[in-house]
Each structure stands twice: as C-alpha cells, then as structure tokens.
Design a protein with these regions (language model features):
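Non-catalytic accessory regions of SAM-dependent methyltransferases
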Residues: 1-153
Length: 153
C-alpha cells in the first residue's frame, strides 16, 4: 500500500518592514515596548517616551520584534554608553540610560513579576551596585547551528 505524501506549504519569505514607534514601557529584559497594530513590539536599546523607526525582524500572531533604525525623539534619561561594545554585544541591557533610571526600570520589572504571585509579597528594595561597570566575571556564550559565541538576533 502506498503512503500518502503530506502536502507541505512552502515557507513564506519574511519581509522586513520599517515601523514607526513610540515606546510606552520597558519589559523585564530592558527592551522598549511599543504598540504597533495593537500588538506589543519589543525594540532593544530604546526607552519610554522615545519615538523613531525600527526594522521588523520577527513577527508572530500576537507579538513583534524589531531592531532600532533611528530615533527622532530621545528620552531625557538617555546617555551615551560607557562601553564601546554596547551596540554589538547583547550582554548589558540598560547602558543607554542613567543609573537611577536603570534601577527604577529593574524595580518596576521585579514588582510586576511579584504582583503575579498569589501570596502577599513584602516590598523589595533595589540596592545599587558600588560600580556600574567592570564587575562581571563570566559570560554566557550562545550556540546556533555550528556557531558559538555572542550571537546577535
């Protein structure tokens, strides 16, 4: 008896498109979140209140991901990164903002996660580090296909 062949739809080629955005909030990973077509769009290296253009890199039914192309309006708390590798390295997520804002965003992310718990949670204080840079002593390498290292999306 012959087996039937499955009909497999050919994959549609993903088309990158330019998006105009206004960042409304930050997620827990330090990415700016904008609403585009009523879907959340995550754009790394952006801050709340910023407006500009981004290039769509991935989209699914309920969420989009994009990379920053240009900023038309920047946030007041945006700073030049102190690390020369910030643009290409996926390690640090908040070096484009001042340290007080970084602590605030991290505190908000922690609060949002803790609010989802059913048990009451005490107020947690975020303690600033003595040094903002130069304290890391390990890295996490990523693997994709045959490549290992710091792989950017």
């Amino acid at each position: 008896m012959k087996q039937r062949r499955r009909h497999v739809k050919p994959k549609q080629k993903f088309v990158e498109r330019v998006l105009e955005f206004t960042i409304e909030s930050m997620d827990s990973m330090g990415q700016g979140v904008a609403k585009i077509d009523n879907k959340p769009c995550f754009i790394p290296k952006t801050l709340p209140g910023e407006e500009g253009k981004a290039i769509l890199t991935k989209a699914s039914k309920g969420v989009m991901f994009a990379r920053l192309a240009s900023l038309d309006i920047t946030a007041d708390n945006r700073e030049e990164s102190a690390c020369k590798h910030f643009e290409s390295c996926p390690g640090c997520h908040y070096l484009h903002t001042d340290y007080q804002s970084e602590l605030l965003y991290k505190h908000q992310a922690l609060d949002n996660h803790l609010k989802r718990l059913t048990a009451p949670v005490p107020v947690v204080k975020v303690v600033p580090a003595e040094e903002r840079l130069g304290y890391r002593n390990r890295i996490q390498l990523h693997y994709r296909h045959k490549y290992i290292g710091m792989i950017d999306g």
